[in-house]
Amino acid sequence: MSQSNSDDSASSSTQQAGDGQDDVQQNIVWHAHTVSREDRESKLGQRGVVVWFTGLSGCGKSTIANELDRLLIDRGATCTLLDGDNVRHGLCAPPSVLKEEHGEDFAGRFGLGFGPTDREENIRRIGAVTELFASAGVIVLAAFVSPYQRDRDRVRNTIESSGRAGDFLEVFVDTPLEICKQRDPKGLYQKAIAGEIKNFTGISDPYDAPPSPEIHLKWREGQTPHDQASEIIREMEKRGVLGPAKG
């Protein structure tokens, strides 16, 4: 996930909701749908699940997720891919991106940097989006550093509370930090080590390795993204969250 030093000082959490919305929760009720989740899954012929990739920057999350996306599409599945860098251009954009169009006040309230609270909100937003997709029967691939275990656990609870146990598959892309530093495709580690980027996971910010992920992809010399994506396919089939290929 790309990180920008200029965004670290801005945190939406420091702003108050305001605008007379403090009691809005009292006036919001859940509107039941006529079409159920089961109806949608039956129509698609699949189970809506979230495959959540986590790991250090440069570990291979996005590359493996893209390969898995292709394998799933090729076998007739309906899926979508949410990537950490891409959502920072819209849904979870930093203040610097929002400021020009929406103004400084809006950007300060809703733009997200990379401090602990902003990271928490980033994953909360993504978790809510993945829940919407999964409840529609879509297989969701989410590739995010998501460094804090508590935030990943909250997403898991959101997904499984609205669906079933087992609807959230945590994939730990376990690539050693030294290998990630060597890859450094965006030059971020070099900048972080030089002090040009703050709150960088693995350098100046911690990463909570998953203690018991559903899928643990340990780095092995010579293993390709296709090999790793195929391993995930096999595990999904084994767990009964992915049916046979269609067509």
UniProtKB/Swiss-Prot annotation:
GO terms for biological process: hydrogen sulfide biosynthetic process; sulfate assimilation, phosphoadenylyl sulfate reduction by phosphoadenylyl-sulfate reductase (thioredoxin). This is Adenylyl-sulfate kinase. It is an enzyme of class 2 (transferase). Residues 1-24 are annotated as: Disordered. It catalyses: adenosine 5'-phosphosulfate + ATP = 3'-phosphoadenylyl sulfate + ADP + H(+). Catalyzes the synthesis of activated sulfate. HAMAP family: Adenylyl_sulf_kinase. The active site is at residue 146. Belongs to the APS kinase family. GO terms for molecular function: adenylylsulfate kinase activity; ATP binding; sulfate adenylyltransferase (ATP) activity. ATP binds at residues 55-62. It comes from the Bacteria. The lineage of its organism: Bacteria, Pseudomonadati, Planctomycetota, Planctomycetia, Pirellulales. Pfam families: APS_kinase. Keywords: ATP-binding, Kinase, Nucleotide-binding, Phosphoprotein, Transferase. Pathway: Sulfur metabolism; hydrogen sulfide biosynthesis; sulfite from sulfate: step 2/3. Its EC number is 2.7.1.25.
